[in-house]
Amino acid sequence: HQGFALGVFGAGNVGASVTKFVGPPLIAGTTVGATYLGIFPGGWRFIPVLYAVLLVIMGAMTWFMSPHADRMPGAAQPLSQQLAPLKQIRVWRFSLYYVAFFGAYVALAAWLPTYYMDNFDISLQSAAYLTAIYIFPASLLRPYGGYLSDRFGARRIMYWSLGGMLVITAVLMMPNGHIVIDHADGSQTDHLGYAIGLTPFVILVFLLGCAMGVGKAAVFKHIPEYFPDNVGAVGGLVGMLGGLGGFFLPPLFAYTKAWSGFPSSTFFVLFLLSVVCLLWMHGTVVRMLHTESPGLARHIEQPPVAR
């Protein structure tokens, strides 16, 4: 049940959704310059102070309620030995997968409110609520993704998740527009008009969040299977690079939008990222099949008539 356990742990990402739901009403419901209970300032400053109080409460709960004797399986290993797996290309491949699932999730969660307001002309509060519809499944489905990885295998779930992201982003990246045909008499007619409405967009982004939530669990299911003695070092690197992906993707979104002029180019970036991950993973699977089971590989690649 490693996949399920890691998925439950990772479902803490749902805190981003809670912030999207709770933050705007709290900011709007407090008065800038006022003070509540002597410690809570009004306006946007209310949020970080409330967060600091919650951190203190969580720290106290951790201190008093968690076991004080930590399990440290790598305590006897020197640091160089613990970091040795980082020389393997597999670790960096897992990291790229996590950039596609977690880094893209973080980047899109930050990008979507502005996208909604600019392209669908809705308020900030409505944009935050619609963004939460994407964030909730991307977080809460992580335990289910772990369960599916335990049952069907992490690699199969990766194929499903990346394939789903590929199809969804291919639809979302199509720009709104139409073909204009000029006629000999000087008139013009529009043909093949395409424009995605708010409801279809929200549904597709919701499905994209589902694929990301399941995929995040599948990536971390790989780590204890391939690196049982270095889960901390490998998991830390994979998580770090996934977080860095969430930092670098928004500027890339902005650059592609400025270069192309299409707001939907955001999803073109995610489409390319999904393609790279899917091709790298499939190429690795094919190479492993030829190396470890050459007879089976030849049988699969033979045409039916030759078998």
Predicted regions and their residues:
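Residue-level signature of mid-helix packing/kink "hotspots" within the transmembrane helices
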Residues: S17-V18, I135-P143, G246-F247
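C-terminal transmembrane helical hairpin of 12-TM major facilitator-type secondary transporters
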Residues: R155-V219
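Helix-to-loop junctions at the C-terminal end of transmembrane segments
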Residues: L141-G153
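Helix-loop-helix hairpin linking two adjacent transmembrane segments in secondary transporters
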Residues: V8-S66
